[in-house]
């Protein structure tokens, strides 16, 4: 994790805006992980993410299970259950758009989201899933797109009720921790008021990218 965190290193004194977080692992925590069959690297990853998550919630942010892609300065979040193809679909955007647009993957698995007065912003972080793709950058969120596999491509906007039922399960918090749950729910209320949510049924094709681009940016695929 130290290597993954290197791009985010900063010189700062401890303060409410720059709190110190103890990410150290105790011997008992290492042993518990070993007994579960986790590798030392996985134990470290899970422990540090849990501590990071706790702190970002207190700072008015939350982590979301998605591949966050920055396209010409705006972020689109591709979300789905693990194994559906978030990373694969994001890779199609890099393949088919990078020659004409600036395409950057902010985080391939757990972007940090903050609801601000000027909109919702997505941030990169070192905790980025098995592909370890992340960038120390931020972008305003243009849309959230939930993916499901299908032989043909189609997309539709979802109702507010549907949006909540899709988004909440993909947020990260200790669901048995009442305070964490309340913090996430409060932020989601504002998040869903500001960000459109779509459901994309798609295959692995250039046409799927074109459909989403045209829908979100309301323009021709160029």
Protein language model regions, located:
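A noncatalytic interaction/capping subdomain that flanks phosphate/NTP-handling catalytic cores
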Residues: 1-82, 92-102, 106, 112-222
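Conserved lysine of the Walker
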Residues: 86
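Hydrophobic positions on the alpha1 helix immediately C-terminal to the Walker A/P-loop
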Residues: 89
């Amino acid at each position: 994790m130290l290597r993954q965190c290197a791009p985010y290193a900063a010189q700062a004194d401890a303060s409410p805006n720059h709190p110190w977080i103890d990410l150290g692992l105790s011997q008992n925590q290492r042993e518990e992980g070993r007994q579960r069959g986790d590798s030392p690297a996985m134990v470290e990853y899970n422990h540090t993410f849990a501590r990071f998550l706790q702190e970002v919630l207190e700072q008015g942010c939350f982590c979301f299970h998605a591949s966050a892609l920055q396209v010409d300065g705006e972020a689109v979040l591709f979300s789905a259950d693990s194994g559906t193809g978030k990373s694969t679909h994001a890779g199609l955007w890099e393949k088919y758009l990078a020659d004409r647009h600036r395409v950057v993957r902010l985080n391939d698995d757990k972007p940090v989201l903050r609801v601000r007065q000027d909109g919702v912003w997505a941030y990169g972080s070192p905790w980025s899933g098995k592909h370890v793709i992340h960038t120390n950058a931020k972008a305003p969120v243009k849309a959230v797109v939930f993916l499901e596999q299908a032989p043909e491509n189609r997309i539709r906007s979802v109702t507010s009720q549907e949006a909540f039922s899709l988004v909440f399960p993909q947020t990260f918090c200790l669901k048995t921790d009442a305070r964490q749950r309340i913090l996430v729910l409060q932020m989601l209320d504002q998040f869903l008021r500001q960000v459109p949510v779509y459901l994309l049924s798609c295959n692995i094709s250039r046409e799927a990218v074109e459909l989403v681009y045209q829908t979100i940016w309301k323009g021709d695929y160029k």
